[in-house]
Amino acid sequence: VDDGTLARQISSAPFDREGIPTRRNILIDRGTPKDILTDLETAKKLGVKPSENGTENGPAPHRTILVAGDASLKSLIKSIDQGLIVFGTMGAWTGNPYGGNVSGTISLGLKIVGGEIAGRVKNCMFSINSFTHFKDNLIDLTREAKALGNATYPYVALDDVVITTG
């Protein structure tokens, strides 16, 4: 979801930079693409209505929201036999993002063993293919969500993430 209508949120505004009123855009619904972000120029070229995402450099999101799930973070942790909660990354999003390959360094995380937090981890590397992991390895999304810059995300549980230590 991209929503430029939310009050008092980073990147939300009543109008985009081309003067068109912002709205809530459903971009993907249950894994199916539903809409794309456009400005006046892009919309004209594609023969569609603008999505109210015009900026001086082309279309851009206002506030990206990954819709939350039903699980609580506490219940999600209890359901994990062995894993990590990642709170921070450094140098992340290297790899080939266009092909879905994402990797980076976990700067702050907590190790989970037997459904309990067992300690802190840092300076580990992670690697996923976002396309296949979110399609085939998504366990759950929490109902708790965190605002990070111009985005809001729940905690996401993924299976079979490659983690390396040094």
Predicted regions and their residues:
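Dual-mode signal for accessory low-complexity, basic/Gly-rich regions
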Residues: 1-166
